[in-house]
């Protein structure tokens, strides 16, 4: 184990609160892993009293895999190494009686949330996508500020604010009635419980001998409050973060939390990790120069003992097509001469729309590529269908699961019937499953329709009974009983799509069985726990690739998606004003986050870094002349190699006159 001076200090500082300012490529994961090992082997901490919190399941899994080389599997299983939301779920599960929730609650994802709000909102809001998205944002904002619907109603002033407050109240009522929690509840409910119940707070603080939090700069208000509730001024904990890599303010992240922790914990010790083990010196010099234009709570400057490296190239296209072709030609030249492999390259961009021209060009020039999208394995229709069946089995009051599967496959139960059921269920304050068993449905529905509903309910009850005895066969039983593969074949028609979807359902089935059995890192789980975990994973992960095998392909992804990754050669494309920084950030005077995003992209590169932009773009059918990004001029010009550009010549002429 080779550690530098600051890494060693960060690992061995155990007593009291500690903040590690870990620059890009400085080995933060290595420090987190070695600190856990040090706590157990050198300081005699019990694994069951150590909690490590990350932001993604992938990061949590990586920590477990790397710990397995040094600790035994029983020790790893005893630890809680999870995301914030999984930790919140664990607290809710343990304190379920105090919270007075039913233990078989379901979790809501974003699609469920939108579906419910469209159902309860007025036409003026549900038909206006912008307003509906604003309402979703406001509900999340209020929850993270720990504001109840009543508090929001009392402070509402405008008619829109009053409407939003009313729908927030309705939304909360529907969730509780259906025994459902949403994403924000997983942090806000346990935090509120710990705040308002000293006995429970003391118990959890006693349980946690040591807390570690990764990517601390990405915490929002409620996550920071949860950290405070799980610790006290004398607690032992380590937070690892980097204010220069805070790129998620749009989803509530507050880099100011790095400053607040110093205020709330006066005895906080700060350790800086500035040695970068990834990038050549020239890349780091440019990244340091760029980020120095931001205001900082803590000063930090990355350095490297690696070689200095070649100049950073600035490639200029006449238009978007020419920009993409120049990138493709550069990659083809280096790969055909065995200088590089396709997998050594990453193309990073601000928005997903920028990948379209690249894909078209790469296909034309036969360049193999993989594209990172925002789709999750669990958000695919066939997986959502089967998860909804499982959700209804573990929580029959889950109305949204009921609605999704009622006609999958077709049972000839129409929308009119469903509306009548919902109306009666609302009137009698029952779930759709409960009302389907009610004798009164005979008064509002035809006899033939009643029979179809009764048959469906009878079958669900049989599956529920079977699930109590044989959880491992339950998904296969559902797939076979409803003839789901046959139904997919009928609706998808295209052989390739059919094959992909059927492979996906077998992947889900195999994964379910593995989770029931447990594996080297995870304890066996029951069906209820698995359904919650899978739903939560869908919400948390932008992309999940099961059994991912590295392929010799160029990687295309957004700058946000690139965080935590590294590549030999990186292209950051679309370096134009209005794109990076994007127009919204320019108008809202939020340039600093765009600069941090560019910094993150630059520090993904190990050996080579390229910036590209184009002189003209087509927007709404109009040809527009576009200026190079201001960020290019904030870089050390002696380390850049520019292609000739008339705009740049004009810029330098103007600069000399000044």
Curated annotation (Swiss-Prot):
EC number per UniProt: 5.6.2.4
Zinc-finger listed as a keyword: no
One function term, GO molecular function aspect: single-stranded DNA binding
Keyword annotations from UniProtKB, A to Z: ATP-binding, DNA replication, DNA-binding, Helicase, Hydrolase, Isomerase, Nucleotide-binding
Any one GO cellular component localisation term in the record: cytosol
Gene3D superfamilies per UniProt: 1.10.10.160, P-loop containing nucleotide triphosphate hydrolases, PCRA, domain 4
UvrD-like helicase C-terminal domain: residues covered: 281-564
InterPro entries associated with the record: DExx_box_DNA_helicase_dom_sf, DNA_helicase_UvrD-like_C, DNA_helicase_UvrD/REP, Helicase_Rep, P-loop_NTPase, UvrD-like_ATP-bd
Highest taxon listed in the record's lineage: Bacteria
Biological process, per Gene Ontology: DNA replication; recombinational repair
Function recorded in the entry: Rep helicase is a single-stranded DNA-dependent ATPase involved in DNA replication; it can initiate unwinding at a nick in the DNA. It binds to the single-stranded DNA and acts in a progressive fashion along the DNA in the 3' to 5' direction.
The protein's assembly and partners: Homodimer.
Protein name listed in UniProt: ATP-dependent DNA helicase Rep
Gene: rep
């Amino acid at each position: 184990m080779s550690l530098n001076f600051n890494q060693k200090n960060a690992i061995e500082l155990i007593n009291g609160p500690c903040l590690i300012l870990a620059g890009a490529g400085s080995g933060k994961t290595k420090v987190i892993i070695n600190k856990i090992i040090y706590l157990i082997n050198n300081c005699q901490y019990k694994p069951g009293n150590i909690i490590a919190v990350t932001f993604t399941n992938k990061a949590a899994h990586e920590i477990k895999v790397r710990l397995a080389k040094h600790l035994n599997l029983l020790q790893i299983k005893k630890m809680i190494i999870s995301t914030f939301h999984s930790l919140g779920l664990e607290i809710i599960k343990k304190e379920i009686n105090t919270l007075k929730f039913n233990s078989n609650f379901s979790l809501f994802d974003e699609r469920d949330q939108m579906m419910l709000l469209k159902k309860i909102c007025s036409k003026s809001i549900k038909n206006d996508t912008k307003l509906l998205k604003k309402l979703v944002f406001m509900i999340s904002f209020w929850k993270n500020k720990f504001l109840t619907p009543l508090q929001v109603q009392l402070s509402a002033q405008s008619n829109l604010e009053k409407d939003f407050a009313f729908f927030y109240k309705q939304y909360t009522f529907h969730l509780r009635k259906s025994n459902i929690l949403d994403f924000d509840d997983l942090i806000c409910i346990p935090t509120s419980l710990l705040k308002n119940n000293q006995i429970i707070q003391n118990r959890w603080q006693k349980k946690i001998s040591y807390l570690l939090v990764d990517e601390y700069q990405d915490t929002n208000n409620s996550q920071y409050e949860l950290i405070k509730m799980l610790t006290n001024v004398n607690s032992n904990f380590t937070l690892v973060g980097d204010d220069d890599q805070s790129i998620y303010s749009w989803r509530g992240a507050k880099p100011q939390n790095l400053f607040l922790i110093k205020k709330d914990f006066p005895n906080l010790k700060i350790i800086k990790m500035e040695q970068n083990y990834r990038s050549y010196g020239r890349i780091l010099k440019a990244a340091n120069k760029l980020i120095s234009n931001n205001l900082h709570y803590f000063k930090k400057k990355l350095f490297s003992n690696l070689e200095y490296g070649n100049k950073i190239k600035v490639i200029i296209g006449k238009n978007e097509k020419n920009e993409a072709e120049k990138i493709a030609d550069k990659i083809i030249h280096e790969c055909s001469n065995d200088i590089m492999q396709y997998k050594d390259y990453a193309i990073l961009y601000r928005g997903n729309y920028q990948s379209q021209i690249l894909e078209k060009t790469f296909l034309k020039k036969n360049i193999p590529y993989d594209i990172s999208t925002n789709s999750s394995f669990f958000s695919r229709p066939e997986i959502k269908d089967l998860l909804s069946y499982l959700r209804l089995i573990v929580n029959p009051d889950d109305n949204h699961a009921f609605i999704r599967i009622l006609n999958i496959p077709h049972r000839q139960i129409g929308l009119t019937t469903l509306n009548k059921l919902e109306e009666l269920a609302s009137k009698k304050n029952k779930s759709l499953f409960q009302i389907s068993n009610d004798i009164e449905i005979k008064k509002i529905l035809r006899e033939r329709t009643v029979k179809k509903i009764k048959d469906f309910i009878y079958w669900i009850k049989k599956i529920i009974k079977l699930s109590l005895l044989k959880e491992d066969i339950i998904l296969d039983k559902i797939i076979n009983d409803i003839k789901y593969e046959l139904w997919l074949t009928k609706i998808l028609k295209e052989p390739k799509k059919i094959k992909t979807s059927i492979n996906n359902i077998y992947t889900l089935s195999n994964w379910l069985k593995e989770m029931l059995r447990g594996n080297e890192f995870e304890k066996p789980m029951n069906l209820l726990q698995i359904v919650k975990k899978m739903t939560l994973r869908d919400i948390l992960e932008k992309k999940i690739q099961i059994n991912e095998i590295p392929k010799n392909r160029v990687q295309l992804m957004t700058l946000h998606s690139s965080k935590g990754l590294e590549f030999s050669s990186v292209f950051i494309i679309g370096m134009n004003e209005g794109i990076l920084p994007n127009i919204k950030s320019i108008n809202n005077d939020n340039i600093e986050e765009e600069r941090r995003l560019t910094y993150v992209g630059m520090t993904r590169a190990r050996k080579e870094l390229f910036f590209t932009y184009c002189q003209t773009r087509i927007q709404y059918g109009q040809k527009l002349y576009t200026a190079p990004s201001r960020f290019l001029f904030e870089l050390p010009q002696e380390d850049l190699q520019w292609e000739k550009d008339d705009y740049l010549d004009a810029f330098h002429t103007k600069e000399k006159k000044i």
